[in-house]
Design a protein with these regions (language model features):
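Acidic, aromatic-enriched beta-alpha/helix-loop junctions
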Residues: 46-83
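Short acidic/glycine-enriched loop/turn segments that link adjacent beta-strands
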Residues: 40-41, 53
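Conserved small/polar residues in nucleotide/adenosyl-binding loops
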Residues: 90-91
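N-terminal domain-onset segments
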Residues: 1-40
Length: 91
């Protein structure tokens, strides 16, 4: 599962941010987690997890192509990424 990427403490904060975001559309939390590919240019700055679907996190997603965007990402998909050296790609 995606616990490999996010600690229990980070998950608590991300879920709390997700609940606060549902209650207040103007809620604008700071990033809680930075994930990146060590052998590539991709970076994810995550601010919240959907309290109804713990696999989806929200934040800034930059695949290293010069066009970062804000949106949702699957934590399970991030955990399954492999880099060019065939090792776990996101840390």
């Amino acid at each position: 599962m995606n616990n490999v990427l996010i600690t229990a403490e980070q998950r608590i904060v991300l879920l709390a941010n997700g609940r606060a975001s549902l209650e207040n559309p103007d809620f604008d939390p700071a990033p809680v987690v930075k994930l990146f590919t060590p052998d590539g240019g991709a970076t994810w700055l995550l601010t919240e997890i959907d309290p109804d679907d713990h696999d989806h996190a929200f934040g800034l997603c930059d695949l290293g192509l010069g066009e970062p965007e804000i949106g949702w990402v699957s934590l399970n998909e991030l955990a399954s990424l492999r880099g060019g050296l065939d090792r776990k790609s996101v840390v």
